[in-house]
Structure formats: structure tokens, C-alpha cells
Amino acid sequence: MKELVIFDLDGTLLNTIADLAISTNYALRRCGFPEHREEEYFHFVGNGITKLFERALPEECRSSDNVSRVRRYFLEYYSVHNTDYTRPYDKVEELLSVLNSHGVKIAVASNKYQAGTQKLIQYFFPGIDFVSVLGQRDGIPVKPAP
């Protein structure tokens, strides 16, 4: 049996797409940019929130200043609303519990920012023992970088 299993968070342990879409649309609206349907966000996510914002912004508006503005409003909203519609996938908590009971170490490595990753793990999996929960941090490349 494996000694350690490392999971991604968004799209693996948790279905976060609705809260990501709503929060990004909030930020886009606050900055005067067009919003997107939730389904479109499946094409925007992956590689961290900076990439999410770059993909959600109109092509001609993808400057670092605009990404920073969208990020600021996104974090303001998402930090309060990141559990509104987010849910664990079926049987995930059961799987994690079984792994814990068999002595398998469990960790999370996510491109979601660190504070958001920790908050969601604590909120949705309070009874699960994770040996490490790592999200996106300044100065550390996002996955899949080593």
C-alpha cells in the first residue's frame, strides 16, 4: 500500500467551479469587464488564479494592472463566499477516512492560493488528518512546476 497520497483540491476533492465563477464574475463586473457563464469557467481554471483572470479578461485587456484589479475584488468576495456552492465530490470524505484509518498519509497540493486552500480543507474535512496542505504561495512556481 502507498505511504503517501497527494490530492489536488479544485476538481478533485471539491467541486468549486460555481463559487469560482460567481466570484470572478463579481470581480469582472466591479472592474467594468464582461462576465461569463459558469460553463465557460471550465476552460478558464487550472494553473492558479492569475491564469484564471487572464483567461476571463477580454484579450485586449489582459494587462498586469487589470489582472491585479480583478484579483483584489475576487479575493475580497471569494474569501467570504468560497463555501456558498462548493461541495466535496461524492465519496471523497469516505475515501479520505479510509486512507487515514489504514495509516496512509494524505496531503493536498493546489494552485489555489494558500489561505483559500487551508480554509476549504478545514471547512469541508475537519475530521481528516492531512500531513500537509499546500496552496499557491509567492515566489513558488505553480503546478506542474517541480
Model segments located where?
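Helix-loop "lid/cap" segments that line or gate small-molecule binding pockets
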Residues: 27-28, 48-63, 120
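Phosphate- and divalent-cation-binding pockets in alpha/beta enzyme and binding domains
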Residues: 23, 52, 91, 116-119
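Metal-dependent phosphoesterase signature
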Residues: 31, 55-94, 102-104
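Substrate-recognition "cap/lid" segment bordering the active-site pocket of phosphatases
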Residues: 84-87, 113-146
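Substrate-recognition element of Asp-dependent hydrolases with the DxDx(T/V) motif
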Residues: 95-122
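Core-facing hydrophobic residues within beta-strands of well-ordered domains
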Residues: 2, 96, 128-131
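Active-site neighborhood of HAD-like aspartate-dependent phosphohydrolases
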Residues: 1-43
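Hydrophobic "anchor" residues on beta-strands that sit immediately upstream
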Residues: 4, 107, 132
